[in-house]
Curated annotation (Swiss-Prot):
Compartments where located: Cell membrane
Name of the protein in its database record: Metalloendoproteinase 3-MMP
Gene Ontology biological process terms from the UniProt entry: defense response to fungus; proteolysis
InterPro entries per record: M10A_MMP (IPR033739), MetalloPept_cat_dom_sf (IPR024079), Pept_M10_metallopeptidase (IPR001818), Pept_M10A (IPR021190), Pept_M10A_Zn_BS (IPR021158), Peptidase_Metallo (IPR006026), Peptidoglycan-bd-like (IPR002477), PGBD-like_sf (IPR036365)
Lineage: Eukaryota, Viridiplantae, Streptophyta, Embryophyta, Tracheophyta
CC cofactor note: Binds 1 zinc ion per subunit.
This protein's domain notes: The conserved cysteine present in the cysteine-switch motif binds the catalytic zinc ion, thus inhibiting the enzyme. The dissociation of the cysteine from the zinc ion upon the activation-peptide release activates the enzyme.
Activity vs pH: Optimum pH is 7-8.
Keyword Disulfide bond applies: no
One cellular-component annotation, GO: side of membrane
Gene that specifies this protein: 3MMP
Motif mapping: Cysteine switch: 121-128
Length: 384
């Protein structure tokens, strides 16, 4: 019994802490105090570095170096925690690579346009992996010459992949996904992810089915705050919004401290509040990572790393479609246009054995009690 108590204390204090994130159908539903907190994005302080250039020293510049290191632009790991405020060659090279990736004027100077891009909320996945950027390179797929005209045309693709081009194996085309039960998500929130999966399902031979058993699903989805066990801690509202891992890992984590809009009305466009993030827009992007896509330098594409607050972007572009079809092929029923998303597909394989039962309406406390009950019960059976 003592061993069980010790184990429970360990779980309570050291296990990743899921959070009950804030979900709102529209801006008027967001409490005013949360809107005020959301506007205090610490990244906005980077705007004070406008005009900074190599050879100078600026107070607080070390924080911008930490930003660039997090997203892969600075690879010198021995400098972690020891960055200076000097605008050195390391930072200049990082700025130049960032400007190339986002198709900005490459100067190595922290001009206004560059810094305005830097402070936009974004995906937590890096743009540069092991010192190599795939965002700006593109791939020339074909070239056509016209005799007598001296003209050449070529098509360039901007989609990218994780190193090694990982993908789900051919024998796993019906992928399952589940939500961390400790988040106690409602059906309204879960339906947002269903719509997001459908957008990728329509253009590939893959299918996505919601199940209840979180521990055995191909894709696991959860909302967390701060450090949550994967070495990629979240950093508060309006900075890194979410991250997802390459196949076949299947982990999809979202920042539980954001104000999430779940209305899901219409296609691309703007939502009515600038201090909130459209959940479906972020979900569609992160599912692209789950399938093996990296970031794209095409600003209108789903796989572009940033999304402006108040923006809704959910429609796959040609770049997104061609990238995922390179990995998996096309859906034989796809004709180049989207149809309205079908109703949510769900196959209940939960431990409860109750067909069709959903945990979406249960409280956070109920889910936590059930979660720890099964841990204690399992340990009891093991020890006796």
């Amino acid at each position: 019994m003592v061993r069980i108590c010790v184990f429970m204390v360990f779980l309570l204090f050291f296990a990743p802490s899921p959070v009950s994130a804030g979900f709102y159908t529209n801006s008027s539903a967001i409490p005013p105090q949360l809107l005020r907190n959301a506007t205090g994005n610490p990244w906005n302080s980077f705007l004070n570095f406008t005009g900074c250039h190599a050879g100078k020293k600026y107070d607080g510049l070390y924080m911008l170096k930490q930003y660039f290191q997090h997203f892969g632009y600075i690879t010198e790991t021995n400098l972690s925690g020891n960055f200076t405020d000097d605008f050195d060659d390391i930072l200049k090279n990082a700025v130049e690579m960032y400007q190339r990736n986002f198709q900005l004027n490459v100067t190595g100077v922290l001009d206004e346009l560059t810094l305005k891009h830097v402070v936009i909320p974004r995906c937590g996945n890096p743009d540069v992996v092991n010192g190599t950027s795939t965002m700006h390179s593109g791939r020339k797929t074909f070239e056509v010459s016209f005799a007598g005209r001296g003209q050449r045309f070529h098509a360039v693709k901007h989609y990218s992949f994780f190193p090694g081009e990982p993908r789900w194996p051919r024998n796993r085309r019906d992928l399952t996904y589940a939500f961390d039960p400790r988040n106690a998500l409602t059906e309204e929130v879960k339906s947002v992810f269903s719509r997001a999966f459908t957008r990728w399902e329509e253009v590939t031979p893959l299918t996505f089915t919601r199940v209840e058993r979180f521990s055995t699903s191909d894709i696991s989805i959860g909302f967390y705050s701060g450090e949550h066990g994967d070495g990629e801690p979240f950093d508060g509202p309006m900075r890194t919004l979410a991250h997802a891992f390459s196949p076949p890992t299947g982990h999809f984590h979202l920042d539980g401290e954001e104000n999430w809009i779940v209305s899901g009305e219409g296609g691309d466009g703007f939502i009515s509040v600038s201090e909130a993030v459209d959940l479906e827009s972020v979900a569609v992007h992160e599912i692209g990572h789950l399938l093996g896509l990296g970031h794209s330098s095409v600003e209108g594409s789903i796989m572009y790393p940033t999304i402006r607050t108040g923006r809704r972007k959910v429609d796959l572009t040609t770049d997104d479609v061609e990238g995922v079809q390179y990995l998996y092929g096309a859906n034989p029923n796809f004709n180049g246009s989207r149809s309205p998303p079908p109703s949510t597909q769900q196959r209940d394989t939960g431990d409860s054995g109750a067909p069709g039962r959903s945990d979406g309406s249960r409280s956070v406390l109920t889910n936590l009690l059930q979660y720890y009950f099964w841990i204690i019960f399992g340990l009891f059976l093991y020890l006796v």
